[in-house]
Each structure stands twice: as C-alpha cells, then as structure tokens.
C-alpha cells in the first residue's frame, strides 16, 4: 500500500540485506531510480536508489550542460541503500523538478523541494553515515523518505493537478 508509514528498522534483522537487494532488483526491473519499502508493502524505514554516478561535478555547470554531458559520457550505476534515513538539514532554496513515481506509473508533475539536503542513515554494513546530496539525488532521497511517511509526490502539488492525475490513474487502472 503506497501510503503505508514505515516503522524504525531493527539493524540486527538478518533479512535486511536480502530485502535491500530485492528492493534494488525490483526498482531496476521497473526502470525506477528509487524505491521505498512501503511501496512494496514492507512497513520498514528502508529506501534504495540509483541516480547514477558521473565523473564530473554537476555544480560546475548548468542543467543543460549537465544533461548534454550525461548524453555524451553516460552514467555508471551507483546504488545506495539506506536504513532508517532521516533528513537532518536542508537548503532553504527550493528547486522545481519533474517527478514521477513507480506507485503512479506514467504520471509526472513538477514538485518544489529543497535543492540540497543532509541525511543520516545506516548502510547495509550497519555503519552510520551522513550524506550531503544535491540535485537529482537530493530530490530522490526526499521523494523516497516521503513514501516512508505515507506521502506521495502528488501531495506536494495543487489540489486541482492532484485530482486530475488521480482521476486519470484510476480510469487507467480500471481499464486493466
């Protein structure tokens, strides 16, 4: 259920690595860049994502230059697995970025979110980590943590846009 709220994950759980690996596989098979455990009916605070890794810093260029460089040089896989992620600080500047979701396939909307964040989490090796993220990765982390809190990306857009998307999605779902 997509609006399930995830509960704190016990780090001693032996199944954790299997769950995280299965989540990554599910995400890759769906051509997604992020997945929260709550999206696949696991009420734990687990997220996985892969926004790719580049050999250049996107902060040094415009979004157009960045997209052109990606097209020319490609992106290496860079999976990230987070247990009990928590955003501890964020930039006051909001950036609008188009978002989609595996829970509402085929529908996108522009969402404003902090352009950079700092997140603490435990990795699959039970190491506590802090990550500073910006750009697409920051958006993806916020989107997935929202899922853990029962929030969808459409909850961040106007009521009218949300209703239009939901009506279309329900109509599409009813056809199948």
Locate predicted features.
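Single conserved hydrophobic/aromatic residue that forms the stacking wall/gate
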Residues: 1-6, 11
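Charged, well-structured alpha/beta interaction segments
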Residues: 22, 26-39, 43, 47-50
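Active-site recognition of the HExxH zinc-binding catalytic motif
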Residues: 27, 139-147
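Helix-adjacent hinge/juxtasegments
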Residues: 45-97
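Flexible, small-/acidic-enriched active-site or ligand-binding loops
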Residues: 98, 102-112
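Post-HEXXH active-site segment of zinc metalloproteases
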Residues: 105, 138-139, 150-176
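Short polybasic amphipathic segments
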Residues: 117-122
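Short pre-active-site segment immediately N-terminal to the catalytic Zn-binding motif
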Residues: 123-139
